[in-house]
Amino acid sequence: TPTTPSRSTDASTTPLIPEKVGLFGVDESFNPCNDFYNYACNKWAVDTPLAHNESYISYSFHTLFLKNERELSKLLSPDRSTGYFPQLSEFFSSCMDEGTLDTVGLQPLLTAVDEMLSAGSVESTVAWMHRHQFGALFSTYVTQSPVNSSLPVLSLGTGGLGLPSKSYYEADARNSSRVVAYLNHLDSLAKLLVTHGNAQVRSIFAGLDNVANDVLDLESRLGVEQWSPEESRDPQHMYDAIGFAGVDARTTSFDWSAYASAVGIDTSLPSVQQLVLHEPRTMLDALQSVLVDYAEPTAPHNRIFKAYLVLHMTSALAPFVTAPFRDEYLRYSNVVHGRTEDLSRFYYCLGWLENSPLGMVLSQLYVLRHFSHDQRAAAEDLVERVQAAFGKRLDNSAWLDEQSRAGAREKLTKMTNHIGFPDVWPSAEGLALLRSDSLLANVMAVRVFQTTEAHAELGKPVDQGKWYMLPHEVNAYYDPLINSIFFPAGILQAPF
Protein backbone atom coordinates (compact mmCIF):
# COMPACT_ATOMS: atom_id res chain seq x y z
CA THR A 1 0.00 0.00 0.00
CA PRO A 2 1.46 3.41 -0.99
CA THR A 3 2.35 5.66 1.92
CA THR A 4 2.74 9.40 2.14
CA PRO A 5 6.38 10.37 1.48
CA SER A 6 8.08 11.80 4.55
CA ARG A 7 10.13 15.00 4.52
CA SER A 8 13.38 13.64 5.96
CA THR A 9 15.76 15.97 7.77
CA ASP A 10 18.63 13.57 7.15
CA ALA A 11 21.21 15.48 5.07
CA SER A 12 22.18 12.25 3.35
CA THR A 13 18.66 11.82 1.99
CA THR A 14 17.47 13.87 -0.98
CA PRO A 15 13.98 15.18 -0.15
CA LEU A 16 11.28 14.18 -2.62
CA ILE A 17 10.12 17.81 -2.74
CA PRO A 18 12.97 20.32 -2.50
CA GLU A 19 12.28 23.23 -0.17
CA LYS A 20 13.00 25.71 -2.97
CA VAL A 21 9.89 24.54 -4.81
CA GLY A 22 7.74 25.96 -1.99
CA LEU A 23 5.73 23.83 0.40
CA PHE A 24 3.18 26.42 1.46
CA GLY A 25 0.37 24.60 -0.37
CA VAL A 26 1.11 21.02 0.70
CA ASP A 27 -1.52 19.21 2.78
CA GLU A 28 0.08 16.03 4.10
CA SER A 29 -3.28 14.66 5.22
CA PHE A 30 -3.72 13.59 1.60
CA ASN A 31 -1.85 10.67 0.08
CA PRO A 32 -0.07 11.99 -3.04
CA CYS A 33 -0.33 8.57 -4.67
CA ASN A 34 -4.12 8.76 -4.47
CA ASP A 35 -4.84 12.49 -4.71
CA PHE A 36 -1.78 14.47 -5.69
CA TYR A 37 -3.70 17.65 -6.50
CA ASN A 38 -5.04 18.07 -2.96
CA TYR A 39 -1.72 16.92 -1.51
CA ALA A 40 0.06 19.70 -3.40
CA CYS A 41 -2.57 22.45 -3.29
CA ASN A 42 -5.23 21.93 -0.64
CA LYS A 43 -3.56 23.94 2.14
CA TRP A 44 -3.18 26.90 -0.21
CA ALA A 45 -6.78 26.51 -1.39
CA VAL A 46 -8.10 26.47 2.19
CA ASP A 47 -5.90 29.37 3.33
CA THR A 48 -6.54 31.59 0.29
CA PRO A 49 -9.77 33.57 0.43
CA LEU A 50 -11.74 34.11 -2.76
CA ALA A 51 -13.03 37.65 -3.07
CA HIS A 52 -16.78 38.03 -3.52
CA ASN A 53 -16.26 39.62 -6.94
CA GLU A 54 -14.03 36.80 -8.20
CA SER A 55 -14.97 33.37 -9.48
CA TYR A 56 -11.48 31.86 -9.43
CA ILE A 57 -7.94 32.54 -8.27
CA SER A 58 -4.56 31.18 -9.34
CA TYR A 59 -1.47 31.73 -7.22
CA SER A 60 1.17 32.58 -9.81
CA PHE A 61 -1.13 33.88 -12.52
CA HIS A 62 -3.31 35.94 -10.19
CA THR A 63 -0.31 37.78 -8.77
CA LEU A 64 0.81 38.80 -12.24
CA PHE A 65 -2.75 39.63 -13.35
CA LEU A 66 -3.01 42.15 -10.52
CA LYS A 67 0.45 43.55 -11.22
CA ASN A 68 -0.26 44.01 -14.91
CA GLU A 69 -3.68 45.55 -14.24
CA ARG A 70 -2.02 48.19 -12.06
CA GLU A 71 0.41 48.98 -14.86
CA LEU A 72 -2.35 49.09 -17.47
CA SER A 73 -4.39 51.40 -15.26
CA LYS A 74 -1.52 53.87 -15.25
CA LEU A 75 -1.12 53.63 -19.01
CA LEU A 76 -4.81 54.34 -19.56
CA SER A 77 -4.93 57.53 -17.52
CA PRO A 78 -5.49 60.49 -19.87
CA ASP A 79 -2.27 62.27 -18.99
CA ARG A 80 -0.23 59.14 -19.79
CA SER A 81 -1.87 57.85 -22.99
CA THR A 82 -3.03 60.93 -24.86
CA GLY A 83 0.42 61.87 -26.07
CA TYR A 84 1.03 58.40 -27.48
CA PHE A 85 -2.18 56.74 -28.62
CA PRO A 86 -5.13 59.09 -28.13
CA GLN A 87 -7.69 56.49 -29.25
CA LEU A 88 -6.94 54.51 -26.10
CA SER A 89 -7.90 57.40 -23.88
CA GLU A 90 -11.00 58.25 -25.94
CA PHE A 91 -12.37 54.71 -25.87
CA PHE A 92 -11.54 54.04 -22.24
CA SER A 93 -12.84 57.41 -21.04
CA SER A 94 -16.12 56.94 -22.91
CA CYS A 95 -16.53 53.56 -21.20
CA MET A 96 -15.72 54.77 -17.69
CA ASP A 97 -17.98 57.85 -17.88
CA GLU A 98 -21.24 56.30 -16.69
CA GLY A 99 -22.72 59.73 -16.00
CA THR A 100 -22.62 60.60 -19.69
CA LEU A 101 -24.19 57.24 -20.54
CA ASP A 102 -27.16 58.08 -18.33
CA THR A 103 -27.42 61.60 -19.73
CA VAL A 104 -27.36 60.39 -23.34
CA GLY A 105 -30.04 57.83 -22.54
CA LEU A 106 -31.23 54.86 -24.55
CA GLN A 107 -31.54 56.61 -27.91
CA PRO A 108 -28.24 55.29 -29.36
CA LEU A 109 -29.41 51.71 -28.74
CA LEU A 110 -32.87 52.39 -30.15
CA THR A 111 -31.35 53.97 -33.24
CA ALA A 112 -29.22 50.86 -33.78
CA VAL A 113 -32.27 48.62 -33.34
CA ASP A 114 -34.23 50.68 -35.87
CA GLU A 115 -31.34 50.43 -38.33
CA MET A 116 -31.21 46.66 -37.94
CA LEU A 117 -34.97 46.19 -38.32
CA SER A 118 -35.03 48.33 -41.46
CA ALA A 119 -32.18 46.44 -43.16
CA GLY A 120 -34.68 44.75 -45.49
CA SER A 121 -34.57 41.05 -46.34
CA VAL A 122 -33.77 38.26 -43.90
CA GLU A 123 -30.34 37.97 -45.52
CA SER A 124 -29.63 41.70 -45.14
CA THR A 125 -30.87 41.70 -41.55
CA VAL A 126 -28.70 38.75 -40.51
CA ALA A 127 -25.76 40.31 -42.37
CA TRP A 128 -26.28 43.58 -40.48
CA MET A 129 -26.20 41.67 -37.20
CA HIS A 130 -23.04 39.81 -38.19
CA ARG A 131 -21.22 42.91 -39.48
CA HIS A 132 -21.80 44.42 -36.04
CA GLN A 133 -20.84 41.11 -34.36
CA PHE A 134 -24.23 40.33 -32.84
CA GLY A 135 -25.40 36.73 -32.70
CA ALA A 136 -28.09 35.67 -35.17
CA LEU A 137 -28.98 32.13 -36.39
CA PHE A 138 -25.42 31.10 -37.33
CA SER A 139 -21.93 32.54 -37.52
CA THR A 140 -19.40 32.94 -40.33
CA TYR A 141 -15.75 33.52 -39.56
CA VAL A 142 -12.29 33.20 -41.07
CA THR A 143 -10.05 30.34 -39.94
CA GLN A 144 -6.94 28.55 -41.12
CA SER A 145 -7.62 25.50 -43.23
CA PRO A 146 -6.57 22.38 -41.31
CA VAL A 147 -5.62 20.71 -44.60
CA ASN A 148 -3.60 23.68 -45.87
CA SER A 149 -2.51 25.94 -43.03
CA SER A 150 -1.14 28.56 -45.43
CA LEU A 151 -4.65 29.45 -46.61
CA PRO A 152 -7.57 31.01 -44.73
CA VAL A 153 -11.06 29.65 -45.35
CA LEU A 154 -14.56 30.86 -44.61
CA SER A 155 -16.11 28.74 -41.87
CA LEU A 156 -19.71 28.30 -40.78
CA GLY A 157 -20.83 27.40 -37.28
CA THR A 158 -23.46 28.02 -34.66
CA GLY A 159 -24.31 31.56 -33.66
CA GLY A 160 -26.99 33.54 -31.91
CA LEU A 161 -27.17 31.10 -29.01
CA GLY A 162 -27.21 32.52 -25.51
CA LEU A 163 -26.24 29.30 -23.72
CA PRO A 164 -22.76 27.79 -23.85
CA SER A 165 -23.29 24.26 -25.18
CA LYS A 166 -25.65 21.66 -26.59
CA SER A 167 -26.66 20.09 -23.27
CA TYR A 168 -28.35 23.31 -22.10
CA TYR A 169 -30.76 23.13 -25.03
CA GLU A 170 -31.94 19.60 -24.35
CA ALA A 171 -35.47 19.24 -23.00
CA ASP A 172 -34.41 17.99 -19.58
CA ALA A 173 -32.25 21.10 -19.00
CA ARG A 174 -35.08 23.64 -19.18
CA ASN A 175 -35.32 23.83 -15.37
CA SER A 176 -31.57 23.88 -14.69
CA SER A 177 -30.24 26.90 -12.81
CA ARG A 178 -28.17 28.08 -15.77
CA VAL A 179 -31.10 27.97 -18.19
CA VAL A 180 -33.44 29.61 -15.67
CA ALA A 181 -30.88 32.40 -15.21
CA TYR A 182 -30.80 32.94 -18.98
CA LEU A 183 -34.60 33.02 -19.18
CA ASN A 184 -34.69 35.57 -16.35
CA HIS A 185 -32.12 37.67 -18.20
CA LEU A 186 -34.14 37.68 -21.42
CA ASP A 187 -37.32 38.47 -19.51
CA SER A 188 -35.65 41.36 -17.66
CA LEU A 189 -34.30 42.85 -20.89
CA ALA A 190 -37.70 42.56 -22.57
CA LYS A 191 -39.39 44.38 -19.68
CA LEU A 192 -36.75 47.13 -19.74
CA LEU A 193 -37.23 47.57 -23.49
CA VAL A 194 -41.00 47.83 -23.12
CA THR A 195 -40.57 50.39 -20.33
CA HIS A 196 -37.85 52.50 -21.93
CA GLY A 197 -38.14 51.70 -25.65
CA ASN A 198 -39.84 53.43 -28.53
CA ALA A 199 -43.10 52.50 -30.26
CA GLN A 200 -41.46 50.09 -32.69
CA VAL A 201 -39.76 48.14 -29.93
CA ARG A 202 -42.90 48.03 -27.81
CA SER A 203 -44.91 46.74 -30.77
CA ILE A 204 -42.53 43.78 -31.14
CA PHE A 205 -43.03 42.64 -27.56
CA ALA A 206 -46.75 43.45 -27.32
CA GLY A 207 -48.67 40.26 -26.59
CA LEU A 208 -45.54 38.12 -26.26
CA ASP A 209 -46.25 37.28 -22.64
CA ASN A 210 -43.72 34.46 -22.50
CA VAL A 211 -41.10 35.93 -24.82
CA ALA A 212 -38.09 34.48 -22.98
CA ASN A 213 -39.34 30.91 -23.45
CA ASP A 214 -40.35 31.73 -27.02
CA VAL A 215 -36.81 32.86 -27.81
CA LEU A 216 -35.34 29.83 -26.08
CA ASP A 217 -37.57 27.58 -28.19
CA LEU A 218 -36.13 29.21 -31.32
CA GLU A 219 -32.56 28.83 -30.08
CA SER A 220 -33.16 25.23 -29.02
CA ARG A 221 -33.93 24.14 -32.58
CA LEU A 222 -30.40 25.16 -33.52
CA GLY A 223 -28.70 24.45 -30.21
CA VAL A 224 -29.55 20.75 -30.05
CA GLU A 225 -28.02 20.22 -33.51
CA GLN A 226 -24.52 21.47 -32.66
CA TRP A 227 -21.61 19.28 -31.67
CA SER A 228 -21.19 18.73 -27.93
CA PRO A 229 -17.92 19.93 -26.34
CA GLU A 230 -16.72 16.32 -26.31
CA GLU A 231 -17.54 15.80 -29.99
CA SER A 232 -15.85 19.10 -30.86
CA ARG A 233 -12.52 17.64 -29.77
CA ASP A 234 -12.58 15.36 -32.81
CA PRO A 235 -10.95 17.22 -35.75
CA GLN A 236 -13.00 15.14 -38.19
CA HIS A 237 -16.20 16.56 -36.71
CA MET A 238 -14.91 20.10 -37.03
CA TYR A 239 -13.99 19.89 -40.71
CA ASP A 240 -16.77 19.34 -43.22
CA ALA A 241 -15.76 20.82 -46.58
CA ILE A 242 -19.37 21.18 -47.66
CA GLY A 243 -18.65 24.15 -49.91
CA PHE A 244 -20.70 27.27 -50.50
CA ALA A 245 -22.92 25.46 -53.00
CA GLY A 246 -23.59 22.64 -50.52
CA VAL A 247 -24.83 25.04 -47.86
CA ASP A 248 -26.91 26.89 -50.42
CA ALA A 249 -28.62 23.68 -51.51
CA ARG A 250 -29.39 22.61 -47.93
CA THR A 251 -31.04 25.89 -46.87
CA THR A 252 -33.23 26.86 -49.80
CA SER A 253 -34.98 29.66 -47.89
CA PHE A 254 -31.77 31.65 -47.54
CA ASP A 255 -29.88 33.41 -50.34
CA TRP A 256 -26.28 32.93 -49.25
CA SER A 257 -24.87 35.05 -52.06
CA ALA A 258 -27.07 37.97 -51.00
CA TYR A 259 -25.99 37.47 -47.39
CA ALA A 260 -22.31 37.35 -48.35
CA SER A 261 -22.59 40.53 -50.40
CA ALA A 262 -24.35 42.36 -47.56
CA VAL A 263 -21.87 41.25 -44.91
CA GLY A 264 -18.85 42.05 -47.09
CA ILE A 265 -17.64 38.62 -48.25
CA ASP A 266 -16.38 38.14 -51.81
CA THR A 267 -18.06 34.95 -53.04
CA SER A 268 -15.76 34.71 -56.08
CA LEU A 269 -12.83 33.73 -53.85
CA PRO A 270 -11.94 30.01 -53.74
CA SER A 271 -11.55 30.28 -49.96
CA VAL A 272 -15.22 31.27 -49.78
CA GLN A 273 -16.48 28.70 -52.28
CA GLN A 274 -14.63 26.03 -50.26
CA LEU A 275 -16.60 26.94 -47.14
CA VAL A 276 -16.05 24.64 -44.15
CA LEU A 277 -18.90 23.61 -41.84
CA HIS A 278 -17.91 23.15 -38.19
CA GLU A 279 -21.20 21.57 -37.10
CA PRO A 280 -23.30 18.55 -38.14
CA ARG A 281 -25.19 18.96 -41.39
CA THR A 282 -28.39 18.53 -39.42
CA MET A 283 -27.73 22.04 -38.10
CA LEU A 284 -28.44 23.30 -41.62
CA ASP A 285 -31.73 21.39 -41.66
CA ALA A 286 -32.62 23.03 -38.35
CA LEU A 287 -31.65 26.42 -39.76
CA GLN A 288 -33.97 25.84 -42.73
CA SER A 289 -36.87 25.08 -40.39
CA VAL A 290 -36.18 28.20 -38.33
CA LEU A 291 -36.09 30.31 -41.48
CA VAL A 292 -39.50 28.99 -42.54
CA ASP A 293 -41.17 29.17 -39.14
CA TYR A 294 -39.57 32.34 -37.75
CA ALA A 295 -37.42 34.43 -40.05
CA GLU A 296 -39.35 34.88 -43.27
CA PRO A 297 -41.61 37.97 -43.27
CA THR A 298 -44.73 35.80 -43.57
CA ALA A 299 -43.53 33.21 -41.03
CA PRO A 300 -46.02 32.41 -38.24
CA HIS A 301 -43.52 33.40 -35.55
CA ASN A 302 -41.86 36.35 -37.26
CA ARG A 303 -42.39 38.67 -34.29
CA ILE A 304 -40.57 36.20 -32.05
CA PHE A 305 -37.69 36.27 -34.54
CA LYS A 306 -37.55 40.06 -34.29
CA ALA A 307 -37.67 39.84 -30.49
CA TYR A 308 -34.81 37.32 -30.64
CA LEU A 309 -32.67 39.72 -32.69
CA VAL A 310 -33.48 42.72 -30.50
CA LEU A 311 -32.77 40.82 -27.28
CA HIS A 312 -29.42 39.54 -28.55
CA MET A 313 -28.44 43.06 -29.58
CA THR A 314 -29.58 44.51 -26.27
CA SER A 315 -27.80 41.88 -24.21
CA ALA A 316 -24.54 42.63 -26.05
CA LEU A 317 -24.94 46.42 -25.75
CA ALA A 318 -26.43 46.59 -22.24
CA PRO A 319 -23.08 47.55 -20.63
CA PHE A 320 -22.81 50.56 -22.91
CA VAL A 321 -26.14 52.28 -22.23
CA THR A 322 -28.20 53.47 -19.25
CA ALA A 323 -28.03 52.27 -15.64
CA PRO A 324 -31.02 49.85 -15.67
CA PHE A 325 -29.47 47.91 -18.55
CA ARG A 326 -25.97 48.05 -17.06
CA ASP A 327 -27.33 46.76 -13.76
CA GLU A 328 -29.07 43.84 -15.48
CA TYR A 329 -25.85 43.00 -17.32
CA LEU A 330 -23.93 42.93 -14.03
CA ARG A 331 -26.61 40.89 -12.27
CA TYR A 332 -26.63 38.23 -14.99
CA SER A 333 -22.84 38.23 -15.31
CA ASN A 334 -22.50 37.63 -11.57
CA VAL A 335 -24.92 34.70 -11.70
CA VAL A 336 -23.10 33.11 -14.64
CA HIS A 337 -19.65 33.51 -13.10
CA GLY A 338 -20.60 32.69 -9.50
CA ARG A 339 -19.81 36.12 -8.08
CA THR A 340 -21.73 37.74 -5.23
CA GLU A 341 -20.39 41.25 -5.82
CA ASP A 342 -19.91 43.33 -8.96
CA LEU A 343 -16.53 43.79 -10.54
CA SER A 344 -15.56 47.43 -10.82
CA ARG A 345 -16.28 49.27 -14.05
CA PHE A 346 -12.52 49.43 -14.67
CA TYR A 347 -12.26 45.67 -15.21
CA TYR A 348 -15.15 45.60 -17.67
CA CYS A 349 -13.84 48.57 -19.63
CA LEU A 350 -10.35 47.10 -19.71
CA GLY A 351 -11.76 43.81 -20.98
CA TRP A 352 -13.77 45.48 -23.75
CA LEU A 353 -10.75 47.52 -24.81
CA GLU A 354 -8.57 44.39 -24.88
CA ASN A 355 -11.10 42.60 -27.09
CA SER A 356 -11.00 45.46 -29.59
CA PRO A 357 -8.22 46.36 -32.06
CA LEU A 358 -7.08 48.85 -29.44
CA GLY A 359 -5.97 45.92 -27.30
CA MET A 360 -2.86 45.66 -29.47
CA VAL A 361 -2.36 49.41 -29.19
CA LEU A 362 -2.44 49.06 -25.40
CA SER A 363 0.03 46.18 -25.64
CA GLN A 364 2.37 48.28 -27.74
CA LEU A 365 2.38 50.95 -25.06
CA TYR A 366 2.89 48.30 -22.37
CA VAL A 367 5.88 46.85 -24.22
CA LEU A 368 7.40 50.31 -24.67
CA ARG A 369 7.20 50.86 -20.92
CA HIS A 370 7.85 47.42 -19.47
CA PHE A 371 9.62 45.07 -21.88
CA SER A 372 12.99 45.95 -23.36
CA HIS A 373 14.72 44.46 -26.38
CA ASP A 374 17.32 43.04 -23.99
CA GLN A 375 14.57 41.15 -22.15
CA ARG A 376 13.30 39.84 -25.46
CA ALA A 377 16.76 38.66 -26.47
CA ALA A 378 17.22 36.90 -23.12
CA ALA A 379 13.87 35.14 -23.48
CA GLU A 380 14.70 34.08 -27.04
CA ASP A 381 17.99 32.63 -25.83
CA LEU A 382 16.23 30.74 -23.03
CA VAL A 383 13.65 29.20 -25.38
CA GLU A 384 16.35 28.20 -27.86
CA ARG A 385 18.33 26.49 -25.09
CA VAL A 386 15.23 24.61 -23.93
CA GLN A 387 14.63 23.44 -27.49
CA ALA A 388 18.25 22.36 -27.81
CA ALA A 389 17.96 20.35 -24.59
CA PHE A 390 14.78 18.76 -25.90
CA GLY A 391 16.62 17.86 -29.11
CA LYS A 392 19.26 16.02 -27.08
CA ARG A 393 16.53 14.12 -25.27
CA LEU A 394 15.07 13.09 -28.60
CA ASP A 395 18.42 11.74 -29.73
CA ASN A 396 18.75 9.71 -26.53
CA SER A 397 15.18 8.39 -26.30
CA ALA A 398 15.59 4.67 -26.83
CA TRP A 399 11.84 4.05 -26.81
CA LEU A 400 11.43 6.01 -30.08
CA ASP A 401 12.00 4.23 -33.37
CA GLU A 402 14.09 6.02 -36.00
CA GLN A 403 11.14 7.13 -38.11
CA SER A 404 9.36 8.71 -35.14
CA ARG A 405 12.55 10.35 -33.93
CA ALA A 406 13.23 11.80 -37.38
CA GLY A 407 9.70 13.17 -37.59
CA ALA A 408 9.93 14.76 -34.15
CA ARG A 409 13.34 16.20 -34.97
CA GLU A 410 12.00 17.74 -38.19
CA LYS A 411 9.06 19.28 -36.34
CA LEU A 412 11.38 20.69 -33.69
CA THR A 413 13.70 22.12 -36.34
CA LYS A 414 10.84 23.82 -38.17
CA MET A 415 9.19 25.23 -35.04
CA THR A 416 9.14 29.04 -34.93
CA ASN A 417 9.17 31.15 -31.79
CA HIS A 418 7.39 34.46 -31.26
CA ILE A 419 8.75 36.12 -28.16
CA GLY A 420 7.40 39.13 -26.29
CA PHE A 421 5.55 40.98 -29.03
CA PRO A 422 4.90 40.90 -32.81
CA ASP A 423 7.69 41.82 -35.19
CA VAL A 424 5.13 44.00 -36.99
CA TRP A 425 2.40 45.60 -34.91
CA PRO A 426 -1.09 45.46 -36.49
CA SER A 427 -2.49 48.83 -37.47
CA ALA A 428 -5.80 50.27 -36.31
CA GLU A 429 -5.54 53.29 -38.60
CA GLY A 430 -8.66 52.28 -40.50
CA LEU A 431 -10.73 52.53 -37.35
CA ALA A 432 -13.05 55.53 -37.39
CA LEU A 433 -12.03 58.31 -35.03
CA LEU A 434 -13.34 57.46 -31.58
CA ARG A 435 -15.05 59.97 -29.31
CA SER A 436 -15.00 60.21 -25.54
CA ASP A 437 -18.68 61.28 -25.48
CA SER A 438 -20.19 58.47 -27.57
CA LEU A 439 -19.47 55.02 -26.17
CA LEU A 440 -22.04 53.12 -28.21
CA ALA A 441 -20.80 54.70 -31.45
CA ASN A 442 -17.28 53.66 -30.47
CA VAL A 443 -18.39 50.09 -29.78
CA MET A 444 -20.22 49.82 -33.10
CA ALA A 445 -17.28 51.28 -35.03
CA VAL A 446 -14.90 48.81 -33.43
CA ARG A 447 -17.16 45.85 -34.22
CA VAL A 448 -17.53 46.76 -37.90
CA PHE A 449 -13.78 47.37 -38.17
CA GLN A 450 -13.02 43.91 -36.76
CA THR A 451 -15.43 42.22 -39.18
CA THR A 452 -13.99 44.10 -42.16
CA GLU A 453 -10.43 43.21 -41.14
CA ALA A 454 -11.31 39.53 -40.78
CA HIS A 455 -12.98 39.33 -44.19
CA ALA A 456 -9.97 41.06 -45.77
CA GLU A 457 -7.87 38.01 -44.85
CA LEU A 458 -9.81 35.83 -47.31
CA GLY A 459 -7.90 35.36 -50.55
CA LYS A 460 -4.54 36.13 -48.94
CA PRO A 461 -1.94 33.77 -47.46
CA VAL A 462 -2.24 33.23 -43.72
CA ASP A 463 -0.16 35.75 -41.78
CA GLN A 464 1.96 33.34 -39.77
CA GLY A 465 3.29 36.20 -37.67
CA LYS A 466 -0.17 37.23 -36.49
CA TRP A 467 -0.74 37.08 -32.74
CA TYR A 468 -4.01 35.74 -31.34
CA MET A 469 -3.07 36.80 -27.83
CA LEU A 470 -2.23 40.26 -26.54
CA PRO A 471 1.47 40.74 -25.71
CA HIS A 472 0.65 42.07 -22.24
CA GLU A 473 -1.36 38.94 -21.34
CA VAL A 474 -0.14 36.58 -18.64
CA ASN A 475 -0.41 33.51 -20.83
CA ALA A 476 1.19 31.69 -23.77
CA TYR A 477 0.11 29.31 -26.51
CA TYR A 478 1.20 26.89 -29.21
CA ASP A 479 -0.43 27.03 -32.66
CA PRO A 480 -0.31 23.49 -34.10
CA LEU A 481 -1.40 24.57 -37.59
CA ILE A 482 1.73 26.65 -38.10
CA ASN A 483 3.98 24.89 -35.54
CA SER A 484 4.68 28.09 -33.62
CA ILE A 485 5.02 29.05 -29.96
CA PHE A 486 3.91 32.47 -28.70
CA PHE A 487 5.27 33.83 -25.42
CA PRO A 488 3.76 37.26 -24.61
CA ALA A 489 5.78 39.81 -22.69
CA GLY A 490 3.19 39.67 -19.90
CA ILE A 491 4.22 36.18 -18.83
CA LEU A 492 7.97 36.70 -19.26
CA GLN A 493 8.48 37.85 -15.70
CA ALA A 494 8.86 36.19 -12.30
CA PRO A 495 7.82 33.60 -11.27
CA PHE A 496 7.66 32.35 -14.87
What are these regions (language model features)?
Residues 35-39, 155, 484-488:
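Structural recognition of the beta-strand scaffold that forms the well-ordered cores
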Residues 1-14:
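Extracellular mucin-like PTS segments
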Residues 45-47, 221-231, 388, 415-426:
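Secretory-pathway/luminal and periplasmic proteins that interact with or process carbohydrate-rich
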Residues 306-317, 436-496:
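Active-site-adjacent "gating/activation" loops or surface patches in catalytic cores
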Residues 14-17, 31-34, 39-106:
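Active-site-surrounding "flap" and adjacent substrate/cofactor-binding loops of secreted or lumenal enzymes
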Residues 28, 215, 396, 400-423:
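Short, well-ordered surface patches within globular domains
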Residues 25-46, 169-191, 400:
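Hydrophobic/aromatic-rich, well-ordered segments within soluble, folded domains that form packed cores
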Residues 71-381, 385, 440-444, 449-450:
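Noncatalytic, helix-rich "gating/capping" subdomain that lines the substrate-entry/channel surface
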